[in-house]
Amino acid sequence: MIALIQRVSQAKVDVDKQTVGEIGHGLLVLLGVQKDDDHVKADRLIEKVLNYRVFSDAEGKMNLNVQQVKGQVLVVSQFTLAADTQKGLRPSFSRGASPDMAEALYDYVVKKCGEKIPTFSGQFAADMQVSLTNDGPVTFWLEI
């Protein structure tokens, strides 16, 4: 399971020109589900995302997590994160989970994050337009 997390001052996701998810200060989480992922990996990733210290403390050090700064989370499915780009000029998606499995784990991540912090989401498998203001910029690739 892969999460590309970005510390943002704002982010939103639109589907068919309608905003379906929007946050202020917090984390945009682009989530890629791979075929060997399961709820155990999802729980580990959720724990890491919610506790990863990427927000500045009073001394300006990255020492606080999204929960401590009372931020929000926007989770957007992104199957392209599971692409194999090692060969050729066209990505292979053979490492990606099946759509049913990916959607179930995506929904699980959104639900579990929402139990701890205000969480919003995109729409699984939709053509989405994501806009954000990356604060820093601060971006991390997390893989479980």
Swiss-Prot record:
The keyword Transmembrane helix does not apply. A motif (Gly-cisPro motif, important for rejection of L-amino acids) lies at residues 136-137. CDD domains: Dtyr_deacylase (cd00563). Its EC number is 3.1.1.96. GO terms for cellular component: cytoplasm. It holds the Pfam family Tyr_Deacylase. SUPFAM superfamilies: DTD-like. InterPro entries: Daa-tRNA_deacyls_DTD, DTD-like_sf. It catalyses: glycyl-tRNA(Ala) + H2O = tRNA(Ala) + glycine + H(+); a D-aminoacyl-tRNA + H2O = a tRNA + a D-alpha-amino acid + H(+). Disulfide bonds: none annotated. It is found in: Cytoplasm. GO terms for molecular function: D-tyrosyl-tRNA(Tyr) deacylase activity; Gly-tRNA(Ala) deacylase activity; Ser(Gly)-tRNA(Ala) hydrolase activity; tRNA binding. Keywords: Cytoplasm, Hydrolase, RNA-binding, tRNA-binding. It is an enzyme of class 3 (hydrolase). The keyword RNA-binding applies. GO terms for biological process: D-amino acid catabolic process. Belongs to the DTD family. A Gly-cisPro motif from one monomer fits into the active site of the other monomer to allow specific chiral rejection of L-amino acids. NCBIfam families: D-aminoacyl-tRNA deacylase. Homodimer. This is D-aminoacyl-tRNA deacylase. It comes from Pasteurella multocida (strain Pm70).
